[in-house]
């Protein structure tokens, strides 16, 4: 059976059973409720981002449940299944599992929990964060985060209303807030007399509240702020446009989703997921680097590049650029990525039955099952893309890793980014050698 089919079967079972049930004090968090339960809440939260196939996540379950029971009534304990709700972890750069984050007084700046994975240690850290929040409130600081620079004013659609997260946009602030922003924006261009705009207003506000901290929603009165409206050739109302981070006027895209808040949230969440950073392609210079990058991932992609003397810096950088491009295209899969120099890790190559003179080469490994697949096509953009696409669809032949489990990674020097150089040869002094001319 193909590697990915086994994985998908496993995921299908775990997604039904779940690592936590409704009987537990651990709250199941999803794309639909994360914003309202965590970000828009005054409660202190600790949230675990996990994958059902992750061994460390399974080991954490009993201690995490115990911590949730102990903190009941004091703080909230939640969990997000990243195989089902990837966009929730995207804004927080979740790369490995389990990842635990504490959402304290400032929900926009959660802190990483890196302590021991025991109920006592988890509870202690959450209580410490709760104490900070209490001190901040006693000192007159707000427990939430305001939408500074939102351009609030007397506009009818955004700004100063209580609980209204829709940003009022104008000719004066549009460029600074939207076009020069690192945030994702959805902007509604409306007219005060437009009936469809009035119908959309409560849905737009609800979506803005749900998406707070992930995607920003704005509204611009196109009958007043005509400079911006004309730039985007607004002719009908409402018109909704999407702006990715760092967009220019020409980069604006039309929104093509539904007009219920749930439709808007789902559409925007998908775009947020697309904008999550691609996983880094690490050089496998030691055991720790490889395990950190791969062990808790569904799959790990290994690239074996030619020796630096056979493929100098420009050549190698071209290969690395190609790998980074593919990691971007397949980032939603949350795979790990490793590259090593050919022949630098003979035990690893032997386990995969690659190497020798066959560089470059690529394999994909499931650490849990010790199953791998090998790229049989060309090591080029199209060949690699086809190989990875087949893996993501559950296609391709797999083999069992040779030997007794994953081999030990030899410690090597990190590549300095420079061309390789042949070792200098020692000059041989022939002056002391007396050769008879007749011997020449």
UniProtKB/Swiss-Prot annotation:
Signal peptide positions (record): 1-18
Residues of the Thioredoxin domain: 19-131, 127-273
Site feature (Contributes to redox potential value) residues: 55-56, 195-196
One GO term (biological process): negative regulation of IRE1-mediated unfolded protein response
Residues the record marks as site: Lowers pKa of C-terminal Cys of second active site: 259
EC number, UniProt record: 5.3.4.1
Motif mapping: Prevents secretion from ER: 437-440
Keyword annotations: Disulfide bond, Endoplasmic reticulum, Isomerase, Redox-active center, Repeat, Signal
PROSITE patterns: THIOREDOXIN_1, THIOREDOXIN_2
Biased composition, class Basic and acidic residues, residue ranges: 410-419
Protein known as: Protein disulfide-isomerase A6 homolog
């Amino acid at each position: 059976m193909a590697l990915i089919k086994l994985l998908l079967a496993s995921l299908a079972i775990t997604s039904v059973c779940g690592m936590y049930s409704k009987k537990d004090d651990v709250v199941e968090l999803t794309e639909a409720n994360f914003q309202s339960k965590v970000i828009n809440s005054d409660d202190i939260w600790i949230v675990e981002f996990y994958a059902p196939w992750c061994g460390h996540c399974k080991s954490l379950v009993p201690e995490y449940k115990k911590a949730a029971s102990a903190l009941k009534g004091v703080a909230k304990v939640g969990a997000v299944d990243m195989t089902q709700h990837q966009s929730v972890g995207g804004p927080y750069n979740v790369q490995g599992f389990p990842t635990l984050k504490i959402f304290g007084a400032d929900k926009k700046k959660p802190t990483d929990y890196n302590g021991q994975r025991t109920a006592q240690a988890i509870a202690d850290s959450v209580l410490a964060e709760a104490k900070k929040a209490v001190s901040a409130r006693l000192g007159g600081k707000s427990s939430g985060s305001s939408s500074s620079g939102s351009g609030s004013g007397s506009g009818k659609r955004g700004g100063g209303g209580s609980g209204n997260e829709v940003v009022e946009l104008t000719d004066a602030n549009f460029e600074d807030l939207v076009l020069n922003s690192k945030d994702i924006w959805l902007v509604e261009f409306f007219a005060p007399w437009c009936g469809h705009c009035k119908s959309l207003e409560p849905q737009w506000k609800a979506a803005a509240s749900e998406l707070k901290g992930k995607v920003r929603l704005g509204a611009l009165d196109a009958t007043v702020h005509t400079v911006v409206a004309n730039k985007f050739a607004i002719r009908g109302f409402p018109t909704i446009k999407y702006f990715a981070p760092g967009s220019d006027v020409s980069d604006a895209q039309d929104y093509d989703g539904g007009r219920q808040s749930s439709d808007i949230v789902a559409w925007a969440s998908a775009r947020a997921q697309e904008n999550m950073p691609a996983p880094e392609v690490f050089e496998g210079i030691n055991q720790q680097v490889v395990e950190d990058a791969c062990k808790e991932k569904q799959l790990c992609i290994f690239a074996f590049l030619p020796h630096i003397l056979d493929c100098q810096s420009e050549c190698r950088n071209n290969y690395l650029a190609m790998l980074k491009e593919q990691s971007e295209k397949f980032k939603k899969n949350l795979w790990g990525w490793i590259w090593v120099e050919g022949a630098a890790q003979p035990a690893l190559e032997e386990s995969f039955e690659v190497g020798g003179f066959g560089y470059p080469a690529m394999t994909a490994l499931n650490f849990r099952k010790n199953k791998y697949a090998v790229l049989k096509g060309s090591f080029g953009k199209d060949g690699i893309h086809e190989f990875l696409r087949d893996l993501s669809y559950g296609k391709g032949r797999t083999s069992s890793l040779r030997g007794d489990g994953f081999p030990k990674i030899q410690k090597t020097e990190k590549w300095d980014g420079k061309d390789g150089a042949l070792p200098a040869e020692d000059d041989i002094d022939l002056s002391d050698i007396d050769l008879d001319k007749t011997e020449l």
